[in-house]
Design a protein with these regions (language model features):
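FNR-like FAD-binding dehydrogenase module
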Residues: 1-304
């Protein structure tokens, strides 16, 4: 069964169906123009770029009296949302934790938009029990064995899966040896955006799995807390020798977060580190990283 989104972005296609139901002549002409080849660009600006909702379009064209069975053809079905699990089944049996950022943006015409799913989740009462359908799929970040050294890069909500990794390894450390983890986290402001601050600090101290005593490390970059922006790749450069040592020990690399520039910037940082520490040319460092990808030891999970 599909659910329709009256507050979702409507799909005004290049056909005149809506104009058939407009009783006001100027509205009919405008809708017919949108459906014409000449109106294609204006339709894009009005509809897709602004992500106007069904209700907003009907408010803009109040004379349109569409039968329900026609209206549903324009209303988008609700899409499934994909989230990385941010908990370990060893630490939280029968639970699944999610790390969700409330999506918000401003359109070119200064309309404030908020993500439907993330806003809905943020508005839930923590004490209220609700039932939702959930589907589990194999992700792009395989669960690592306890003796595999890890280099984790997770700015923003990209840290979500690595919270589960750290929880899992902390439980595994109680019953046997584990390999070290170093984690690079980044956000804009330490005061406002430092996700799971207490969790990371707890595990990076007192012989925790991220502590230097265990061969690990936790490094945070706060991009807007100083005049010069600092990102995860800058923190990686500061720890280039530690990264190189772990790579020489067979470490796997996991990268998660925004799919804009971050994954490519992180890859370039690894190239620079490998070239610097090994003395090899950048081309050789790039080939070595590609060999890690082919061997299943360089994983990226990115989203827009």
């Amino acid at each position: 069964m599909s659910h329709l989104l009256l507050h979702g972005a409507i799909s005004l296609r290049q056909d005149p169906v809506m104009s058939f139901f407009a009783t006001a002549e100027h509205e009919k002409e405008r809708l017919q123009y949108f459906a014409s080849p000449e109106g294609r660009d204006d339709l894009y600006q009005y509809n897709q770029k602004e992500r106007r909702t069904v209700l907003e379009v009907l408010e803009d064209f109040p004379s349109v009296q569409m039968p329900f069975e026609w209206l549903v053809e324009l209303v988008p079905p609700m899409k499934n949302r994909a989230f990385s699990i941010s908990s370990s089944p060893l630490a939280h049996p029968n639970q699944v934790h999610l790390t969700v950022d409330v999506v918000s943006w401003t359109t070119p015409f200064k309309r404030k938009r908020r993500g439907l799913c993330s806003t809905g989740l943020a508005g839930l009462d923590p004490e209220q029990k609700i039932y939702i359908p959930v589907w589990f799929h194999k992700g792009l970040l395989p669960s690592p064995p306890p003796l595999l050294p890890l280099i984790l890069i997770g700015p923003g909500t990209g840290c979500a899966p690595f919270r589960g990794f750290v929880e899992e390894r902390a439980i595994q450390s109680l019953s046997g040896p584990i390999a070290p983890i170093i984690l690079f986290f980044g956000c804009q402001n330490e005061e406002n955006d430092f996700l799971y601050r207490d969790f990371w600090l707890f595990h990076s101290q007192n012989d925790g799995v991220l502590s230097e005593a265990k061969g690990g490390g936790f490094y945070a970059a706060f991009s807007r807390d100083q005049p010069q922006k600092v990102y995860v790749q800058h923190k990686m450069q500061e720890q280039s020798q530690r990264i190189w040592n772990l790579l020489c020990e067979g470490a796997a690399i996991y990268v998660a977060g925004s799919s804009t520039k971050m994954p490519s910037d992180v890859m370039l940082a690894f190239e620079e580190i490998i070239s610097k520490e090994s003395g090899a040319p950048r081309e050789s460092a790039a080939r070595w990283l590609r060999s890690l990808e082919k061997a299943g030891k360089y994983h990226v999970e990115a989203w827009s």
